[in-house]
C-alpha cells in the first residue's frame, strides 16, 4: 500500500475522486481462520463473474481505492464505478426499514401498482435527458431504452409518498375498467357483502378517484350500512346549505324520488335539477343534503345521484327518511 502521494479514480456519478494515500489502511485479506475478508472476496468474485459496472451507495466511495489496489495487484481491469446517493426519508434521515419506511412489498400490499412504483423509483436520483426530460410517466421498456448513467444525480433524493400516491392514482385512471375491477374486486368484496350491489358499478365509480387500493374500504363502507353521522355534515359553506334548508330540501326531494319510475343516474339528476329550478334554488341546495343523507360522509366516491343509482330506490329512500328524522330532532 503506498503511503505517500495521492490516488485518483473515476466514478460515473461523482467524477474524478482523489484520496491521500496516507489515509488508506493496510487492509487484511485473510482472516485467522484462513477465510478471505469481504473486501478481498468481493473483488475476486466480481472479476470472476465478469462484472463491468459496480453500482452501489455513495457511502462506499471510500472503499473504491482499496478495491482498486487489489485489481491492480492481480492485473485485472478495474470496473466502472457508479456510486448512487441515498434515498432520504426527509432532509436529514435516510430511508430505513428499521424506522418503518416501506419496502417494495409493503407498497404493493398497500395497493400501489408495480408500474407506478417502478416509474416513481426510477426517477429518484436520476432524470432523463433531451426530448424525454419533461415527461413524468414511463413504461419499464421505455426506462430501459432511455436510461443513461449520466442522468444520475450526486444529490440525495427525498422519497415523497404523496407524489407516489399521485402517480399511482394516474396509473389507476389509465387502467381499463376490466383491469381495475380485477384488482379492486377482492377489496370491495371484503367490505360490501350485500349481493344486490353491483360491484362492477362500484368499481367504475371509484376508479377515477382511487389513489391506492387500500383506500377503498373507507371510501365504500357506507354502501353496506349507513354509518352513524353528525348533522353537521349538512352544513356546507360552498354549497350554501344549512340545517334548515337541508331539511326542506330532503322533504321536497322525497316525493320526487318516490315517484320516479326510472332509477338511473341520468333520470335522478334530471328530476332533482328540475326540482331545484322549481324551488328557485341552486342545484347544490338539493344535491348536497341528498349526498349526505345517503352516505353519511363528507367525502364520497360519487355525487348524490350516482350514489342513489348505486344503492337502489328502496335503500336510498330509506336513508333520506333517516336524514329527515335526524334533522327534525
Task: Locate the predicted segments by residue.
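C-terminal accessory/binding modules appended to enzymatic or scaffolding proteins
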Residues: 243-291
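Basic, amphipathic alpha-helix used for nucleic-acid engagement in HTH/winged-helix/SANT-Myb modules
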Residues: 234-235
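Short alpha-helical basic/polar micro-motif
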Residues: 52, 65, 115, 162, ...
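Catalytic adenosine-cofactor/nucleotide-binding cores of aminoacyl-tRNA synthetases and other
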Residues: 74-231, 240, 295-329
Amino acid at each position: 500500500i503506498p503511503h505517500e502521494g495521492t490516488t485518483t479514480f473515476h466514478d460515473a456519478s461523482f467524477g474524478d475522486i482523489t484520496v491521500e494515500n496516507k489515509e488508506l489502511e493496510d487492509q487484511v485479506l485473510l482472516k485467522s481462520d484462513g477465510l478471505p475478508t469481504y473486501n478481498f472476496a468481493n473483488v475476486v468474485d466480481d472479476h470472476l463473474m465478469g462484472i463491468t459496472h459496480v453500482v452501489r451507495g455513495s457511502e462506499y466511495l471510500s472503499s473504491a481505492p482499496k478495491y482498486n489496489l487489489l485489481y491492480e495487484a492481480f492485473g485485472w481491469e478495474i470496473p466502472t464505478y457508479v456510486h448512487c446517493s441515498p434515498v432520504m426519508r426527509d432532509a436529514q434521515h435516510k430511508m430505513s426499514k428499521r424506522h418503518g419506511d416501506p419496502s417494495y412489498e409493503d407498497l404493493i400490499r398497500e395497493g400501489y401498482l408495480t408500474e407506478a412504483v417502478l416509474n416513481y423509483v426510477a426517477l429518484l436520483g436520476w432524470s432523463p435527458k433531451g426530448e424525454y426530460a419533461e415527461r413524468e410517466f414511463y413504461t419499464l421498456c421505455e426506462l430501459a431504452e432511455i436510461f443513461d448513467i449520466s442522468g444520475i444525480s450526486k444529490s440525495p433524493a427525498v422519497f415523497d409518498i404523496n407524489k407516489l400516491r399521485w402517480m399511482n392514482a394516474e396509473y389507476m385512471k389509465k387502467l381499463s375498467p376490466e383491469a381495475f375491477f380485477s384488482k379492486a374486486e377482492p377489496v370491495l368484496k371484503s367490505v360490501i357483502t350485500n349481493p344486490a350491489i353491483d360491484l362492477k358499478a362500484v368499481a367504475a365509480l371509484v376508479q377515477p378517484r382511487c389513489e391506492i387500493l387500500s383506500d377503498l374500504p373507507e371510501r365504500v363502507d357506507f354502501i353496506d350500512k349507513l354509518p352513524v353521522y353528525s348533522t353537521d355534515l349538512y352544513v356546507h359553506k360552498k354549497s350554501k346549505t344549512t340545517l334548515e334548508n337541508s331539511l326542506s330540501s330532503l322533504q321536497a326531494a322525497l316525493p320526487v324520488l318516490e315517484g320516479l319510475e326510472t332509477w338511473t343516474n341520468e333520470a335522478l339528476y334530471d328530476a332533482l335539477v328540475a326540482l331545484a329550478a322549481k324551488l328557485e334554488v341552486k342545484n347544490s341546495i338539493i344535491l348536497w343534503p341528498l349526498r349526505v343523507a345517503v352516505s353519511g360522509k363528507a367525502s364520497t366516491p360519487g355525487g348524490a345521484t350516482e350514489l342513489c343509482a348505486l344503492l337502489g330506490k328502496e335503500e336510498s329512500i330509506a336513508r333520506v327518511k333517516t336524514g329527515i328524522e335526524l334533522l327534525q330532532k
